[in-house]
Amino acid sequence: APKGVSRLDYRHNHFCPVLDQSPRPDALLYRGDEVPLDMNRLCTLRDSALKLPSSSVYIMDSGMAAILGATLDARVRACGPAIVLDVATSHTVAACFEGDELCSFVEYHTKDIRTERMDSLLKELADGQIQHQQILAEGGHGAYTRRALGFDSIEIILSTGPRRSMLAGSSHPIQLGAPLGDNMMTGTVGLLEAIRRREGWSEIPYD
């Protein structure tokens, strides 16, 4: 990141214009030759992957892959406005979707999650009341809001990720997701779906 700009703000500034123009997680999928040169971690992953015997390489932010994967759970696909979460080992991402449209998301450090704060975050997220700088000040990774769905319109809240049991005491009716029948495949499913959309392959049944 340039001097005076935090790494998290710099990453946020990469994501926002892309999502403003194409509000779907798969918009943040990069073919090997498309990875921005200033995204050091993605470039390092790309360079490692290029050593494998493959005709093409795709790279995607793991949080974006996970929330896309969570939306492919059959129960989410059968509903209207939804909140999906991926509670991973290091980071937790919560996102609001209407169909394939990513309306908002927030990213937090999993170790800092407290049930009461996560409950309020989910409502604030859907109501469009979360600000990026506010989340950074709390020690989180940031937030993005394109439009507010309204918490009262949410039809399902679904969680994936290896540490989702941390949300067991939530006051919200959080369902446990398993795209492709396996909670631990969430990110893989999201990456596969992003590549499928890019390549124009036939739809894949993930339930």
Task: Please place each PLM-identified region on the residue numbering.
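Nucleotide/phosphate-binding catalytic cleft detector across ATP-hydrolyzing
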Residues: A1-A82, Y108-T115, Q133-D207
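A charged amphipathic helix-loop-strand protein-protein interaction module that recurs
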Residues: S120-L121, L125-I130
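Gly/Thr-rich phosphate-binding beta-strand-loop-beta motif of the actin/hexokinase/Hsp70
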Residues: G80-G99
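A broad structural signal for short, well-ordered beta-strand segments within beta-sheet-rich domains
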Residues: S54, H91, E101-C103, I154
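Catalytic or ion-translocation cores adjacent to nucleophile or general acid/base/metal-coordination motifs
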Residues: A95-L122
